[in-house]
Amino acid sequence: MSEGAPAAKRARAGRAGNPIEVGYWKIKGLGQPIRLLLVWAGFEWKDTLYECVQKNDGTYDKSSWFDVKHKLGLDFPNLPYLVDGDLKITQTNAILQHLADRAGLSGTTEEERAKVNMLFGLSGDVRRRYTGAAYSPKFDEMRPGLVESIEQKLAELDQFLGSREYLVGQGVTVSDLLWYDLIDQFLVLDPTILDQRCPNLRAFHSRFHNDPKIVAYRESDRFITQLNNTQAFFK
């Protein structure tokens, strides 16, 4: 599979020759597709991880982030953030698009780039419903409807993918990594979520999950397994 993505074979440093820095909570969340893109494209990078800690009184301490939030030189302080040389940016999609542009994973034509952006938007819609439920005290009550809703969207994506290897074009784009990560998280939510209506996505997920670069990352110490933050009801 890697041969379909020549950009992944070139090691890349940050814009100033230093490793790219990703700042985010010590969870998958919005940070994981960024990490996967860095791994796939062969960037040198490092995690700066912030932790949400539950205190004895049941409240949550996020001071590891809030103590430094306005001291990092970010125009719009938020997590995740990316430091690439002298460039400091926030907002997940902006970060992904910047890295994809650098790595040649944004699509090769105007039509492909439009479809990549469409898949960004679709992923945001699905993720918002998933995250809203995961952090709700009514998660157990919401779970069946959430799974049904996600399964419907995945069935549409399965039809869009068809028998192709990649979601857009003839090679890997950032949209593939974005959706691989989401599907991987949804399989924790419900291991059967692809079984009835998504045979193409099952094969799609397996190809990325078993790619040597992804396997090496999953088996490394830097791989994070927690999906959502400590105060979530589905972690």
Spans of features found by a protein language model:
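Short alpha-helical linear motifs
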Residues: S136-M142, R202-A203, D221-N229
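Surface-exposed helix-capping loop/turn segments at secondary-structure junctions
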Residues: L105, Q159-Q170, P212-R218
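GST-like domain detector, emphasizing the conserved glutathione-binding G-site
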Residues: S2-L154, D158, E165
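Hydrophobic/aromatic-lined pockets within catalytic cores
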Residues: A100, G104, G124, G162, ...
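C-terminal helix/juxtamembrane-tail motif
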Residues: G4, I214-K235
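GST superfamily/GST-like fold recognition
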Residues: V116, L167-F208, R218
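Short acidic/histidine-centered micro-motifs embedded in hydrophobic/aromatic stretches
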Residues: L119-L122, A133, Y180, S220-I224
